């Protein structure tokens, strides 16, 4: 199920900045997905973006994975050297979680084509702020 983020009570500036970082990470990683690329290279890109922003210690899971009969299949977007192939159904799901502050995760499902990543999920990545 795709994951999207909402801020309740307006969100602090740190939470809003964190959301912008995760969204940028998602967008840059999606743009880097092409047939023949190693999943590990996309993962390294995500680690660099988040690490350069000072949040590397709070990004402790994989970036995404293949989906098939099982929800977690190859290729993996982590430290593995799985090759991304045309027709692979994958998730892209960067997330950063800060104790005492909150967490942000954006997750989409899609397929790898000759031209890159084509998302199945069409939910906008706009941040929804709910004032209570």
Q: What are these model-predicted stretches?
A:
Residues 1-132:
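Active-site neighborhoods and metal-handling regions in enzymes and metal-associated proteins
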């Amino acid at each position: 199920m795709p994951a999207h983020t909402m801020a309740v009570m307006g969100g602090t500036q740190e939470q809003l900045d964190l959301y912008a970082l995760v969204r940028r990470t998602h967008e840059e990683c999606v743009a880097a997905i092409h047939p023949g690329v190693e999943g590990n290279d996309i993962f390294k890109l995500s680690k660099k973006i988040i690490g350069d922003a000072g949040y590397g210690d709070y990004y402790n899971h994989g970036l995404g994975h293949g989906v098939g009969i099982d929800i977690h299949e190859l290729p993996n977007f982590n430290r593995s050297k799985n090759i991304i192939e045309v027709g692979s159904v994958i998730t892209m799901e960067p997330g950063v979680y800060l104790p005492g502050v909150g967490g942000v995760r954006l997750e989409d499902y899609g397929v790898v084509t000759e031209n890159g990543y084509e998302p199945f999920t069409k939910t906008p990545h706009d941040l929804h702020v709910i004032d209570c």
